[in-house]
Amino acid sequence: MNYTNAEFELAYEEILKRILFDKIPVQNPIAYILGGQPGAGKTQLQKIIFRKNKNVIAINADAYRQSHPRFESIQDEFGDDSPKYTQPFINEIVERLISDLSDMKYNLIIEGTLRTADVPLN
C-alpha cells in the first residue's frame, strides 16, 4: 500500500520524537544487534541490556507498524496478511532510524530475525 513522502515524514517524525523522549546521545555509542528466530531469547537479552543501561533505544519494527498511514484500512482489507502490505513502510522507517540515530550517536538495540545482513551491516 502506497504512502506519500509527506505521510512518511510525518510518521517518522512522530516515531522519532516518541523514542527520543528520555534518551541522550553519547560520545561512544554502542549498538546491540540481536537476531534469531522467534523464541530464541531476543526479548530477554533486551531486558538485560535495559537493566544495565537505560539510555538505549530499541528499534523494533513491529512497534512502528501502526504508524503506517493506511494501517487501519490495510488491516480491514487483508487481516492476518496485512504485515506483508505494511513491510515496505516498516523497512524504510527502520533503516532511516538506524542511520539517523547512529549519526546522532545514540545507543541502539536492533532486534530482528536477521533474514539478511543488509540492515545491521549498513
Give the role of each language-model region.
Residues 1-23:
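N-terminal pre-Walker A segment at the start of P-loop NTPase domains
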Residues 21-29, 101-102:
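Phosphate-binding P-loop
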Residues 37-38:
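The conserved Walker
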Residues 42:
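Conserved lysine of the Walker
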Residues 45:
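Hydrophobic positions on the alpha1 helix immediately C-terminal to the Walker A/P-loop
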Residues 48:
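Active-site signature of alpha/beta-hydrolase-fold catalytic machinery across serine-
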